[in-house]
UniProtKB/Swiss-Prot annotation:
PANTHER family: FATTY ACID/PHOSPHOLIPID SYNTHESIS PROTEIN PLSX, PHOSPHATE ACYLTRANSFERASE. Homodimer. Probably interacts with PlsY. This is Phosphate acyltransferase. Belongs to the PlsX family. InterPro entries: FA_synthesis, Phospholipid_synth_PlsX-like. Pathway: Lipid metabolism; phospholipid metabolism. It is found in: Cytoplasm. One of its GO terms (cellular component) is cytoplasm. The keyword Nucleus does not apply. It catalyses: a fatty acyl-[ACP] + phosphate = an acyl phosphate + holo-[ACP]. GO terms for molecular function: phosphate:acyl-[acyl carrier protein] acyltransferase activity.
Length: 329
């Protein structure tokens, strides 16, 4: 049975939504959950019938979101540190954390190590498009990058799309301010030349292209990727609020909403980040899933499912094999 280490105390809302997510996941798939945190608090939240699927790793130090991640390596009793070490010591196959993302990234890189020929791990997240979803990386791990880093992100993203998303020939694009090869800054232009080596590279893409379903993997540095991600989340939130306001303005609008409610529910599901659960940190030797600090039970459940799917794949082997085929120096 696959064991997953869960940072049970790390989210913005404490342990309750995290444990509820674990419970929901256990009702749908079989795995062993190793809950890292205060056992006295956690045990009261677990139904008796699930006790055989639960283990506890004692940790009382919780990394606050406003604390500096540079201290992560010193705080060996933190929930994130102990969860990472469960994976390092092969007591768990993956970690899921909604805690301090900087501390998680730092500890995962230093304690678990990088894959062969990977200079920088990257956070990859799924964003909705008109047909399905687009994988975007990096969305926050690396604000400053070199062209070889972005090339490695492309290899990792392509491997994830093949192994996890089951896209046989994922279309890979580079985020830029225009589709033409001559557009972009020096980093974008240098990266474009490297990416030409990839058979599935379709060229530059503008920010709007992520939503039209013409690309499967979008490559960018973590600075621009994080802005793109947060902008997308903000636009989705504003559209939802505007729709609610308009629906309340008249009886006909309310009636129309009732008639179209199934379609609205489908739309909500399609754009809801909790449907994806979390973002894998690609490029480290083991599976690390970083969830949003505001994750509710559904997001935690789906993050666990991501971890299980990752551990059952050959993604890291695929990344190392693909990288060995290219010369990027």
């Amino acid at each position: 049975m696959t064991s997953i280490a869960i940072d049970a105390m790390g989210g913005d809302f404490g342990e309750k939504p995290i444990i509820e997510g674990v419970i929901q996941a256990l009702k749908e798939r079989e795995f062993k959950a190793i809950l890292v945190g205060d056992p006295q608090k956690l045990k009261t939240l677990i139904p008796q019938e699930l006790n055989s699927y639960i283990e506890y790793e004692e940790a009382f130090d919780v990394f606050a979101m406003d604390e500096n991640s540079t201290d992560a390596l010193k705080r060996k009793d933190s929930t994130i540190y102990k969860a990472i070490d469960l994976v390092r010591n092969q007591k768990a196959k993956a970690i899921v954390s909604a805690g301090h993302s900087g501390a998680t990234m730092s500890l995962a890189t230093l304690r678990l190590g990088r894959l062969a020929n990977i200079a920088r791990p990257a956070i990859a997240t799924l964003m909705p498009n008109i047909h399905s979803r687009t994988l975007v990386l990096d969305v926050g791990a690396n604000v400053d990058c070199k062209s070889e880093h972005l090339f490695q992100f492309a290899i990792m993203g392509e491997a994830y799309a093949k192994e996890i998303l089951k896209i046989a020939k994922p279309r890979v694009a580079l985020l830029s301010n225009g589709e033409e090869e001559c557009k972009g800054n020096e980093l974008t232009k240098e990266t474009h030349q490297l990416l030409k080596q990839l058979p599935n590279f379709v060229g530059n893409a503008e920010g709007r292209d992520i939503f039209n379903g013409t690309i499967d993997v979008l490559v960018c540095d973590g600075f621009n990727g994080n802005i793109l991600l947060k902008t997308g989340e903000g636009v989705a939130s504003v559209i939802t609020k505007l729709l609610k306001q308009e629906i309340q303005k008249s009886f006909l609008a309310k009636l129309g909403y009732l008639l179209a409610k199934p379609a609205f529910n489908e739309l909500k599901t399609h754009i809801d980040y909790e449907e994806y659960g979390g973002a894998p940190l690609l490029g480290v030797k083991e599976c690390v899933i970083i969830s949003h600090g505001k994750s509710g039970p559904k997001a935690i459940k789906n993050a666990i499912f991501q971890a299980l799917n990752f551990t059952q794949s050959n993604i890291n082997q695929t990344i190392e094999k693909e990288l060995s085929n290219y010369e990027i120096n």
